[in-house]
């Protein structure tokens, strides 16, 4: 499991949002930074991505993923399959320690270096040390509130930050509208 962050993606109605907390933790007990941005817009702003894991590894993966998006003409599904395949098979890439959540207006995927490519059934996905808490909160908020995707993502991270010591309330969020 990758500690020191929580990333949540929510698709609801005409909106897809990815949100992440800002905490960077060194080791088990030192907070190094409170307001890091772990969410990026890619491919002319049509795709959003978030990472959990080593920062340098995440930047490498963002660059590789954007390259795959360009090669696929912006097709998120195809680019996600290609980055998962390359990540797993490349000797250098497979040593990278990170997870990605990538999304466009239609789909959300979790991508890992071991070859997993997961599209959630309910349009909600989370990664990182507080991921399970944020996921549970987002599912409840989605089912029992009228909040939009952005609001669900932010509120679920706030809930996770009250439980997970590696997650804080310095939240950044990116939204794509259909």
UniProtKB/Swiss-Prot annotation:
GO terms for molecular function: metal ion binding; threonine-type endopeptidase activity. This is ATP-dependent protease subunit HslV. A double ring-shaped homohexamer of HslV is capped on each side by a ring-shaped HslU homohexamer. The assembly of the HslU/HslV complex is dependent on binding of ATP. Belongs to the peptidase T1B family. HslV subfamily. It holds the Pfam family Proteasome. It catalyses: ATP-dependent cleavage of peptide bonds with broad specificity. CDD domains: protease_HslV (cd01913). SUPFAM superfamilies: N-terminal nucleophile aminohydrolases (Ntn hydrolases) (SSF56235). It comes from Syntrophomonas wolfei subsp. wolfei (strain DSM 2245B / Goettingen). The gene is hslV. Na(+) binds at residues 161, 164, 167. Allosterically activated by HslU binding. Protease subunit of a proteasome-like degradation complex believed to be a general protein degrading machinery. Keywords: Allosteric enzyme, Cytoplasm, Hydrolase, Metal-binding, Protease, Sodium, Threonine protease. GO terms for biological process: proteolysis involved in protein catabolic process. One of its GO terms (cellular component) is proteasome core complex. Its EC number is 3.4.25.2. PANTHER family: ATP-DEPENDENT PROTEASE SUBUNIT HSLV, METALLOPROTEASE TLDD. Gene3D superfamilies: Glutamine Phosphoribosylpyrophosphate, subunit 1, domain 1. The active site is at residue 5. The keyword Magnesium does not apply. The keyword 4Fe-4S does not apply. It is found in: Cytoplasm.
């Amino acid at each position: 499991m990758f500690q020191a962050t929580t990333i949540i993606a929510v698709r609801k109605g005409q909106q897809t949002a990815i949100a992440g907390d800002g905490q960077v933790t060194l080791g088990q007990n030192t907070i190094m930074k409170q307001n890091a941005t772990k969410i990026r817009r890619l491919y002319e702003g049509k795709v959003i991505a978030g990472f959990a894991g080593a920062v340098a590894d995440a930047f490498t993966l963002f660059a590789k993923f954007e390259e795959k998006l360009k090669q696929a003409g912006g097709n998120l599904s195809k680019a996600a399959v290609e980055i998962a395949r390359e990540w797993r098979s490349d000797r250098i890439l497979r040593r990278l320690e990170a997870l990605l959540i990538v999304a466009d207006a239609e789909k959300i995927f979790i991508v890992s270096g071991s070859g997993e490519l997961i599209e959630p059934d309910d349009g909600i996905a989370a990664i990182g040390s507080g991921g399970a808490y944020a996921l549970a909160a987002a599912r409840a908020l989605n089912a029992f509130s009228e909040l939009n995707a952005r609001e669900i993502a932010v509120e679920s991270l706030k809930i996770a930050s009250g439980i997970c010591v590696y997650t804080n309330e310095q939240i950044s969020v990116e939204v794509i509208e259909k």
